[in-house]
Amino acid sequence: MQHGIYYAYWEHEWNGNYHYYIDKVAKLGYDILEIAAGPLPEYSNEELKALKDHAKEQNIRLTVGYGPALENNIASSDPQVRKHALDFYTDLFQRMEKIGATLIGGALYSCWPIDYSKPVDKKGDWERGIEGMAKLGKIASECGIEVLGLECLNRFENHVLNTA
């Protein structure tokens, strides 16, 4: 049995010094550290390599979590947003491959949180989400990503997969 924890347990922001948390979770006896996807597109290849090497030195497996922003919603009714989302995920998955992360979890099928102040197309969002996840699966497999973990949210955060 392996045990892991999300770096954000100790953070108030969606970014942090992942090297610090690699050391911290290693000292605490964890095997896995989940980091946020959001900052990874800003990392250089050298920074990605350093992160991978540090995790390997500490015997920590990295995984990634993501609450997709509106502009990365693969279920959006706007085809340009869906295209942008697929481009974002393609880049993200390539970066995940560089750090050795083979699992990403989150509301990958939509966005987080959903904006209920605007009209919601539940059936369309569901159908586009399924279509988008099929595309994400192909991209992920090309990048060595083994698990696309779909997070169920509460009903106030999303309507596609929720706990209601």
Predicted regions located by residue number:
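A short acidic, helix-capping loop that chelates divalent metal ions and anchors anionic groups
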Residues: 70-76, 112-117, 156-157
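Short, electropositive alpha-helical surface patch
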Residues: 52, 56, 61, 116-128, ...
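Basic- and aromatic-lined ligand-binding clefts that recognize polyanionic substrates
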Residues: 141-164
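Conserved beta-strand positions
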Residues: 33-35, 106, 150
